[in-house]
Amino acid sequence: SLDPKYKTTYNSFVQNISDKKITLDILTFNYTDTIENIADQLEAHPEYADKIVVENIYHIHQQLNELGIILGVNDENQIQNKSLSFHPDIKATMIKPYINSEYVSGTDNECKQAIDRANMVILFGVSLGATDRMWWNYLGEHVAAYPQRIIYCPYEEDTSALDMSEVIIRNNGLITRCANNMYLANNAYSAVTPKIYPIRANRMFNFGLTHNVEANHSKVIAQLTTKINATI
């Protein structure tokens, strides 16, 4: 849930948004159809069932299908061997934004457009890692410049009760972590931090669903091994 400070600013923000229809675009970094399976099994709250529409589900790094998945890093600077980092074949194997742009799947542009038109972006189940730096940077710059908000739902193993000081320190740390991983200029950084609302003690990760994790893991490893062997 949101702590009182963020709940107040959140409520003030959403008052200016029409609640006649809530359209969701889901951008997933997962290679599997997990999000589709979850969406199929969950039931909407009766109060919102007629208002919420899942418009699109975008797989940023593609899916486990005949086209293959996109595994790798964000840019050439994240490849340690500099003699290979700018080689076209290495880029076509390891640089995720390059693969999407060269294959012209249109996924990157569709995902950016989804971010552009959103009133609110919910970060859920993401590591904010450097290998997807372009996405965190794009999101941060856009939210800093436009009237959008970010709901940040981190995974926390420790959900024990905190006193007020601990809550403030915890929330400040989460906001800083989120903003730091967006690699923003000072003015954009200052603009985006008040727009990040951290969730505390959330149970969003408790779906109660059974997934064949090992099977999906094996598929990912197999495709990665095939790609690496093809470039050797």
For each predicted feature, which ranges?
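Extended, H/D-rich, highly charged conserved domains that either
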Residues: 1-103
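Short, conserved clusters of charged catalytic residues that mark active-site
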Residues: 8, 106, 134
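Active-site-adjacent structural elements in folded domains
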Residues: 103-109
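SIR2/sirtuin-family catalytic core signature
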Residues: 109-232
